[in-house]
Protein backbone atom coordinates (compact mmCIF):
# COMPACT_ATOMS: atom_id res chain seq x y z
CA UNK A 1 0.00 0.00 0.00
CA UNK A 2 1.27 3.52 -0.83
CA UNK A 3 0.77 5.85 2.12
CA UNK A 4 1.48 9.60 1.96
CA UNK A 5 2.06 11.72 5.08
CA UNK A 6 1.28 15.45 5.10
CA UNK A 7 1.53 18.11 7.83
CA UNK A 8 4.70 17.20 9.70
CA UNK A 9 7.86 19.26 9.27
CA UNK A 10 9.81 16.18 8.25
CA UNK A 11 11.91 13.29 9.40
CA UNK A 12 14.30 12.36 10.93
CA UNK A 13 12.74 13.96 14.00
CA UNK A 14 14.93 16.70 15.46
CA UNK A 15 12.38 17.80 18.05
CA UNK A 16 8.66 17.85 18.58
CA UNK A 17 6.05 15.26 19.28
CA UNK A 18 4.46 15.28 15.82
CA UNK A 19 7.71 14.54 14.01
CA UNK A 20 8.69 11.82 16.49
CA UNK A 21 5.23 10.25 16.18
CA UNK A 22 5.38 10.32 12.37
CA UNK A 23 8.91 8.87 12.30
CA UNK A 24 7.88 5.98 14.55
CA UNK A 25 4.75 5.29 12.52
CA UNK A 26 6.27 5.49 9.03
CA UNK A 27 9.29 3.33 9.81
CA UNK A 28 6.98 0.65 11.23
CA UNK A 29 4.79 0.82 8.13
CA UNK A 30 7.88 0.30 5.96
CA UNK A 31 8.86 -2.74 8.06
CA UNK A 32 5.33 -4.08 7.52
CA UNK A 33 5.90 -3.90 3.75
CA UNK A 34 4.17 -0.65 2.81
CA UNK A 35 5.61 2.01 0.51
CA UNK A 36 5.64 5.24 2.52
CA UNK A 37 6.15 8.85 1.42
CA UNK A 38 6.65 11.79 3.78
CA UNK A 39 6.39 15.40 2.60
CA UNK A 40 9.19 17.42 4.19
CA UNK A 41 9.99 21.11 4.55
CA UNK A 42 13.46 22.22 3.41
CA UNK A 43 13.90 24.39 6.52
CA UNK A 44 13.62 21.20 8.64
CA UNK A 45 14.85 18.23 6.56
CA UNK A 46 17.80 18.53 4.19
CA UNK A 47 16.31 18.48 0.70
CA UNK A 48 19.20 16.27 -0.52
CA UNK A 49 17.91 13.48 1.73
CA UNK A 50 15.59 11.40 -0.49
CA UNK A 51 15.18 8.34 1.71
CA UNK A 52 15.37 7.72 5.45
CA UNK A 53 15.13 4.23 6.98
CA UNK A 54 13.22 3.03 3.93
CA UNK A 55 10.83 6.01 3.86
CA UNK A 56 10.66 8.11 0.67
CA UNK A 57 11.06 11.83 1.38
CA UNK A 58 9.48 14.49 -0.85
CA UNK A 59 10.87 17.97 -0.20
CA UNK A 60 8.61 20.86 -1.19
CA UNK A 61 9.24 24.57 -0.76
CA UNK A 62 7.01 26.55 1.57
CA UNK A 63 6.60 30.05 2.94
CA UNK A 64 8.69 29.64 6.08
CA UNK A 65 6.93 32.18 8.29
CA UNK A 66 5.11 31.69 11.59
CA UNK A 67 1.65 31.90 10.05
CA UNK A 68 2.21 30.42 6.58
CA UNK A 69 4.80 27.67 7.12
CA UNK A 70 2.49 24.69 7.66
CA UNK A 71 -0.44 25.76 5.50
CA UNK A 72 1.67 26.72 2.47
CA UNK A 73 3.55 23.43 2.65
CA UNK A 74 0.32 21.47 3.02
CA UNK A 75 -1.18 23.27 0.02
CA UNK A 76 1.85 22.34 -2.11
CA UNK A 77 1.68 18.74 -0.87
CA UNK A 78 -2.01 18.48 -1.82
CA UNK A 79 -1.20 19.73 -5.32
CA UNK A 80 1.72 17.29 -5.57
CA UNK A 81 -0.62 14.41 -4.70
CA UNK A 82 -2.21 14.78 -8.14
CA UNK A 83 0.99 13.28 -9.61
CA UNK A 84 1.03 10.39 -7.15
CA UNK A 85 -0.67 7.02 -6.95
CA UNK A 86 -1.72 7.16 -3.29
CA UNK A 87 -3.73 4.46 -1.55
CA UNK A 88 -4.05 6.45 1.69
CA UNK A 89 -3.23 10.04 2.68
CA UNK A 90 -2.50 10.69 6.37
CA UNK A 91 -2.58 14.29 7.61
CA UNK A 92 -1.02 15.37 10.90
CA UNK A 93 -2.06 18.33 13.08
CA UNK A 94 -5.08 20.59 12.98
CA UNK A 95 -3.64 23.37 10.79
CA UNK A 96 -2.59 21.12 7.90
CA UNK A 97 -5.77 19.07 8.28
CA UNK A 98 -7.81 22.15 7.40
CA UNK A 99 -6.89 21.39 3.77
CA UNK A 100 -8.33 17.88 3.75
CA UNK A 101 -11.10 19.26 1.52
CA UNK A 102 -8.48 20.04 -1.14
CA UNK A 103 -6.95 16.56 -0.98
CA UNK A 104 -10.44 15.04 -1.27
CA UNK A 105 -11.20 17.25 -4.26
CA UNK A 106 -7.93 16.43 -6.03
CA UNK A 107 -7.80 12.71 -5.11
CA UNK A 108 -11.42 11.53 -5.01
CA UNK A 109 -11.87 8.07 -3.59
CA UNK A 110 -8.54 8.02 -1.74
CA UNK A 111 -9.13 7.52 2.01
CA UNK A 112 -7.96 10.43 4.16
CA UNK A 113 -6.88 9.95 7.78
CA UNK A 114 -6.05 12.77 10.15
CA UNK A 115 -4.25 12.67 13.48
CA UNK A 116 -4.76 15.48 15.97
CA UNK A 117 -1.83 15.78 18.34
CA UNK A 118 -3.00 18.77 20.36
CA UNK A 119 -5.53 21.60 20.33
CA UNK A 120 -3.21 24.01 18.53
CA UNK A 121 -5.66 26.88 18.96
CA UNK A 122 -5.04 26.80 22.71
CA UNK A 123 -1.35 27.64 22.29
CA UNK A 124 -0.56 31.17 23.41
CA UNK A 125 1.59 31.87 20.34
CA UNK A 126 -1.51 32.27 18.13
CA UNK A 127 -3.57 35.43 17.86
CA UNK A 128 -7.37 35.55 17.63
CA UNK A 129 -7.58 35.17 13.83
CA UNK A 130 -5.14 32.24 13.74
CA UNK A 131 -7.07 30.53 16.56
CA UNK A 132 -10.32 30.95 14.66
CA UNK A 133 -8.75 29.48 11.50
CA UNK A 134 -7.45 26.50 13.49
CA UNK A 135 -10.86 25.88 15.09
CA UNK A 136 -12.57 26.02 11.69
CA UNK A 137 -9.89 23.72 10.30
CA UNK A 138 -10.49 21.23 13.10
CA UNK A 139 -14.22 21.24 12.42
CA UNK A 140 -13.77 20.78 8.66
CA UNK A 141 -11.23 17.99 9.14
CA UNK A 142 -13.48 16.11 11.57
CA UNK A 143 -16.33 16.21 9.07
CA UNK A 144 -14.36 15.34 5.94
CA UNK A 145 -11.70 12.88 7.08
CA UNK A 146 -12.52 9.21 6.64
CA UNK A 147 -10.89 8.48 10.01
CA UNK A 148 -9.84 10.81 12.84
CA UNK A 149 -7.19 9.83 15.38
CA UNK A 150 -6.62 11.80 18.59
CA UNK A 151 -3.45 10.84 20.42
CA UNK A 152 -3.72 13.28 23.32
CA UNK A 153 -6.08 13.30 26.25
CA UNK A 154 -6.64 16.62 28.02
CA UNK A 155 -5.04 16.68 31.48
CA UNK A 156 -7.40 16.24 34.41
CA UNK A 157 -8.00 19.31 36.52
CA UNK A 158 -8.03 18.33 40.17
Tell me the role of every PLM-derived stretch.
Residues 79, 105, 131-148:
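Membrane-proximal helix-turn-helix segments that form the acceptor-binding/catalytic region
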Residues 53-79, 123-130:
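A short, charged, and often flexible helix/loop element on the N-terminal side
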Residues 91, 150-151:
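Short beta-strand scaffold positions
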Residues 4-15, 21-22, 28-68, 154-158:
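N-terminal strand-loop element at the rim of the active site
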Residues 71-80, 86-116, 120-121:
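An aromatic- and histidine-rich active-site surface loop
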Residues 2, 35-37, 111, 146-147:
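Residues at the starts of beta-strands that form the adenosine-phosphate
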Residues 65-66, 97-98, 112-130, 144-147:
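A short, histidine- and acid-enriched strand-loop-helix "catalytic/donor-clamping" loop
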Amino acid sequence: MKVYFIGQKGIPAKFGGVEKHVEELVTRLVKAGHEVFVYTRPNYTDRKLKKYRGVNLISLNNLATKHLDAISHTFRACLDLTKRDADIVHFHSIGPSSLIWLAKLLKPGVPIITTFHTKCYEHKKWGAFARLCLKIGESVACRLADKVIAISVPPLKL
